[in-house]
Amino acid sequence: PAPRGLCRGDKVGPLRPSMCGIAGIFRLPSARGLSAHELGTLVRTVAHRGPDGEGLTYLGTRDGALGEVTAEGDWTVGLGHRRLSILDLSESGRQPMQLGDQPLWISFNGEIYNYLELRAELEALGQTFRSHSDTEVILGAYAAWGTAGIARLRGMWGFMLVDGRRRVAVLSRDRLGIKPLYYRAWDDRLAVGSELKQLLALPGVTARADERALSEYLATGYEDPSRTFFDGLVSLPAGTYAELSLDTLRLSSPASYWAPERVQVTVHDADEAAARLRHVLAEATRIHLRSDVPVGCALSGGLDSSAVVVLVDQLNRREATPAPLHTFTATFPGEAIDERR
């Protein structure tokens, strides 16, 4: 069936959010404050991001090794997650997730589009997987390649990965910063979240303006990628990762794993350029369609979304049982912002 917009009276089921929510607390054994109750607050504050489940994991040192403990135990790492199921809808895909019996845990928001290719590569190296999720592939990539594995990911993400062997937590965001990751640091503890309001919900954190960030934005129109408009609340810059020592809670300076390159492209004529663009766009669209739930498209009156919808429809028609493609348009009749134009 051809793609079409939705009309009044159409029934397509409830609309779902397009994100998960992550939360984390890291603290020294001597730290006071930020208890299991506060981790629950961080998670509940973003309940709207993940309607499909909630998970909490507490980690502490036992016999010299990091492992799971109870909320009432002597924990120093708390990971939380609100789940929106897109890949592997079973309980095997729930988070926070551990990689088998290895001391690697993750809370992840986003989607890794090339997870099937990475999974095949990791299986060739001898790794086995318990789920069909992209989350487990991130853990596997880190186990195989360390932080160098981050550059192999194609997708959008914000995650916290805890490495019990190295006793570090790795925080990372995707190349363009599509998915957010914020944190608030004290001397003896650090809190992480997907949204600023999670951190603002913590005791002792006030919504005080960062006057320097505001003045720089008003003067230049640009934002510092590592700052927010709230004093003390920090954004991890896009395209970077940072390592947090679990023993000292010292956070490294963000390290870039990617930067756009200037590429010299040579084409002989407009037809060749169009063919190459179509190939690249079709390939990107194809891997973005990997999902275990129905996929829809936002459709405005512009060329970008129209081209994507046409490609999605063409790819969909190649399937044995094509699914209806629903498109969504923000319409404001008579207004300049009407997206049908």
Question: Which ranges hold each PLM region?
Answer:
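Cysteine-centered catalytic environments shared across enzyme families
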Residues: 16-341
